[in-house]
């Protein structure tokens, strides 16, 4: 039994690709037809690819690995954050800072600084510092939290990355390739599927479509940690549909 149904994918609009003039020929095998200048993705293939991605993530986590969820485009930001938090994994949803993987030691020093300021805010240090200094510290804190908040507990480079739109996240993809990190992600008809170890052909521009697939990947993490299959867990998918239709 598949972890997702064609009905769910259809209702979420996962089948809508890009305009035919904006495409990558390497995605041809995942395209079903063309309608009104838009490519329609073959959802039968997407169902199988969601399964592959699901079990790839489940396998990583079951073996003690960590997953980093990445999606900095507006349509992905909320679901990447909420689903990563739901399954207890890391995320980047604002901006990919160059070197987040390849220069992780430097990133760790910035995370250390973020935690130092958090401690100062919580232990009463802010109350005894000059007002001007506190304002500057709060500004620094806000910026660090925005860019690094989702990875502040990440102690090392993750074993796998789930990415929404590899074309948008090209720096992340390059760094993952350099370090041999497993890449799983949603690729629209304008992407290069060969950049990913496990590709899910689908609409990466619709909030509902992105939420549905990211939620399934979070389910894979939860199943690996709890040993319970979540193939019937459609609540998040339905919630995604309701949110868009509301």
UniProtKB/Swiss-Prot annotation:
Gene Ontology, cellular component aspect: cytosolic small ribosomal subunit
Keywords: Ribonucleoprotein, Ribosomal protein
Lineage top rank: taxon: Bacteria
Organism field: Lachnoclostridium phytofermentans (strain ATCC 700394 / DSM 18823 / ISDg) (Clostridium phytofermentans)
Similarity section: Belongs to the universal ribosomal protein uS2 family.
Gene Ontology MF terms: structural constituent of ribosome
Xref: CDD domains: RPS2
Any one GO biological process: translation
InterPro entries: Ribosomal_uS2, Ribosomal_uS2_bac/mit/plastid, Ribosomal_uS2_CS, Ribosomal_uS2_flav_dom_sf
Pfam families listed in its UniProt record: Ribosomal_S2 (PF00318)
Name by which UniProt lists this protein: Small ribosomal subunit protein uS2
């Amino acid at each position: 039994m598949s972890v997702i149904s064609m009905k769910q994918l259809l209702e979420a609009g996962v089948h809508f690709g890009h305009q035919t003039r904006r495409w990558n020929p390497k995605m041809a095998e995942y395209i079903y037809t063309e309608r009104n200048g838009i490519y329609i993705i073959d959802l039968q293939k997407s169902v199988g690819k969601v399964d592959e991605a699901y079990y790839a993530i489940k396998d990583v986590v079951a073996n003690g690995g960590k997953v980093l969820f990445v999606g900095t485009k507006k349509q992905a930001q909320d679901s990447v954050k909420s689903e990563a938090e739901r399954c207890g994994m890391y995320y980047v949803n604002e901006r990919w800072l160059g070197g987040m993987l390849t220069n992780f030691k430097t990133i760790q020093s910035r995370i250390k600084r973020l935690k130092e300021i958090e401690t100062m805010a919580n232990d009463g240090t802010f109350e005894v510092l000059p007002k001007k200094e506190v304002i500057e510290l709060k500004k620094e804190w806000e910026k660090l939290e925005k860019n690094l908040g989702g990875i502040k507990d990440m102690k090392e480079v993750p074993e796998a990355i789930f990415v929404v739109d590899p074309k948008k996240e090209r720096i992340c993809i390059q760094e993952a390739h350099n370090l041999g990190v497993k890449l799983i992600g949603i690729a629209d008809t304008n992407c290069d599927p060969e950049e990913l170890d496990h590709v899910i052909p689908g609409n990466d521009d619709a909030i509902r479509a992105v939420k549905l697939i990211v939620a399934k990947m979070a389910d894979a993490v939860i199943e690996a940690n709890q040993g319970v299959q979540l193939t019937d867990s459609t609540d998040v998918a339905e919630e995604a549909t309701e949110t868009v239709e509301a």
